[in-house]
Amino acid sequence: MLFSSVEFLFRFLPVFMLLYLIVPAKYRNFVLLAGSLVFYGVGEPYFVLLLIFSVVVNYGISKYMFWEPAAPIQNRVQRRVKRRRAALIISLVFDFSLLFLFKYWDFAAGTVNQLAGSELIPVLALTLPLGISFYTFQMVSYQVDCYRGVIEKPPGFVPFAAYVSMFPQLIAGPIVRYDEVADRMCGRRMRIRNLENGLKLFTLGLGLKV
């Protein structure tokens, strides 16, 4: 779904904005998440499941980073460092494996096969999911910040999932670090001035794009 399409401008956006404005503030992340998944699912009905799977796995890994099992005080720091390092490695392997599979596997397989002169590695010809690079690196930045202690407390699942899948930047970026938007994800307020400024910027950007 393109931002300049009739479907987005006159169907999705009005319905989304209406729901977002009328629900209580504590439910707005649910609306944002649901709207973002619908936005992505219209263009990628199968790969929206991959996005959800990636979000669930990354959230589970980040929760493990902050898990504090019972242990003697003198061992807690050392165990925390080891646990966070292991969790970071697992998340990086998972995220970059998916990205490599969909984006670089065929190129690598074709190069190896060409050099070898035979079909050693199968070419999968997988369709590239929209925005996979952006949401993968966004989750990687989140995991790295958790490991480094930049993020001191993990958010709930819905704010995290909404942060990763937020439709305005899901398929075209930019990549945003969680600590830059944490306050707005968990405690933002709707102000008329901000809404007006947002509409002006959107209209200007749409005009430049069209």
What positions do the PLM features span?
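Membrane-embedded transmembrane alpha-helical bundles that form the catalytic cores
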Residues: 1-210
